[in-house]
Amino acid sequence: MAKNVNSKANGKKSGSVKRALKEKKQPEPEFSDSEDDEVDQEKLVEELDEDFDEVANMLGADVTDPEEKKQSKLERKRKRDEEATAEYTKPEVVDNEDDAQNDKFEDAGLSEPTMRAISDMGFKTMTKVQAKTIPPLLAGKDVLGAAKTGSGKTLAFLIPAIELLYSLKFKPRNGTGVIVVSPTRELALQIFGVARELMAHHTQTFGIVIGGANRRQEAEKLAKGVNLLIATPGRLLDHLQNTQGFVFKNLKALVIDEADRILEIGFEEEMKQIIKILPKEERQSMLFSATQTTKVEDLARISLRPGPLYINVVPETAASTADGLEQGYVVCDSDKRFLLLFSFLKKYSKKKIIVFLSSCNSVKYFGELLNYIDLPVLDLHGKQKQQKRTNTFFEFCNAKQGTLVCTDVAARGLDIPAVDWIIQFDPPDDPRDYIHRVGRTARGSNGKGKSLMFLTPSELGFLRYLKAANVPLNEYEFPTNKIVNIQSQLSKLIKSNYWLHQSAKDGYRSYLQAYASHHLKTVYQIDKLDLVKVAKSFGFDVPPKVNITIGASGKSIEKKHKKQKRA
């Protein structure tokens, strides 16, 4: 049953803040039926059908971003990529507005168990990406797919994968027939949940292996036979290299989801090793990516067979974001940002809202602050233990209303139901990040949602980049008399509460550090920031002394502090 988001930090405030801060030889494939096999399979299905909470309890640390490669190396690689990709024919599937709107699952020739599951899930009509992708995948073609976020591509690759296992009558002793690789643990869990629903009436087995989970338990289940396996790259490579009894020589399909994100977070070498280890003969491959970068092309070249079908249901002239999304921005000085956010969250307290910030420490501080002043929120960021991240994610998914304050850990691939508003309190690094953030709302073919981006006057140049990326925005204005001015109360609170003061200082420092690390240096110039005003948004009357090590030296920040104090 749907519930509202409630924070435990609403009780005794100061106390709550203190507590909060204080290879065995592999068997030959045998695709045969027997009654004993059916009994064993049913037993294994029960063992492998793990509950989300069980999986969550085994999760661990976060994945960090790697350093970028040197520009000269990238340029050489880009030229090599362009020459190599010329040998690939990629006939684009042209999308028509009148097409792919009335395609029904019942007309796709799917098996009875799959159709029962789809009916149980409440689906009747395919989305565009499903209508364009499922038929060629069922026909055995390799596919390189591009689609808007929230377009329904999880079903687009899971349905053909499950149909393949069903048609081959896979048994546990045949090992793993399909592997789905996902960039993050949360997304892997989400795909696992969809797979569990789709396979409710099938006898094939399924499972998940992700970083931070109990590796020994995973290995035991792999040895028993997991026909459909969802995995994160690092843990999958570990099992491929080290787990005896993991039968993968009968692999028939490989799915790489969110390929661009997998590469962005540093799994390029792992993916190359995985593809090198996995059998290539008779293997169908599917690669999905929201953006087509040179690295994605490189990965497609080594993972897909020559001549894959390229499916892009988003014409280049179309808007990059969902049709049902209303997008806007507001120009606001740094010292008024938090006051405007507070007023907005108060006004829309009955809505379901996601607020994006640029750093973990900022999320931690504003989460603590908002809960302390009786505006309950949930918070999600990469420094949290995986179990808390997973529990928070599912709590917000199940909530009918409430606010989630988070970093970009929630901005990619995750399907959070019925989000009304996306607030980009801290600006995104580039248009791609903007698109993935707003993609958490207006999901599905008829989804509706709204987004609001906060910009300071010096950041308005970012709008040019969004326009070039076909992102339509309107300027919103908020009357000054509608903004609740709690600046003096905020300042007194930060002065009097040691724990909030420390948290605010950490958040302020991390905000500057993240700002200095932006790629669009012509838009986000730390030297143009009014540090006094920025500090006010964190509750300080005077900017605290901080040392940032990315993009600017601590010395330059100190000088600017002194100059602005004299002013």
Swiss-Prot record:
Residues forming coiled coils: 35-88
Transmembrane segments: none
Short motif (Q motif): ranges: 103-131
Major localisation: nucleus
Sequence ranges assigned to domain Helicase C-terminal in this UniProt record: 324-484
EC number in record: 3.6.4.13
Keywords carried by this UniProt record: ATP-binding, Coiled coil, Helicase, Hydrolase, Nucleotide-binding, Nucleus, Ribosome biogenesis, RNA-binding, rRNA processing
Cell membrane among keywords: no
Comp. bias intervals (Acidic residues): 30-40
Localization, UniProt: Nucleus, Nucleolus
Motif (DEAD box): 257-260
Region (Disordered): 1-109
Database matches in SUPFAM superfamilies: P-loop containing nucleoside triphosphate hydrolases
Domain writeup: The Q motif is unique to and characteristic of the DEAD box family of RNA helicases and controls ATP binding and hydrolysis.
Listed name of the protein: ATP-dependent RNA helicase HAS1
Source organism per UniProt: Scheffersomyces stipitis (strain ATCC 58785 / CBS 6054 / NBRC 10063 / NRRL Y-11545) (Yeast)
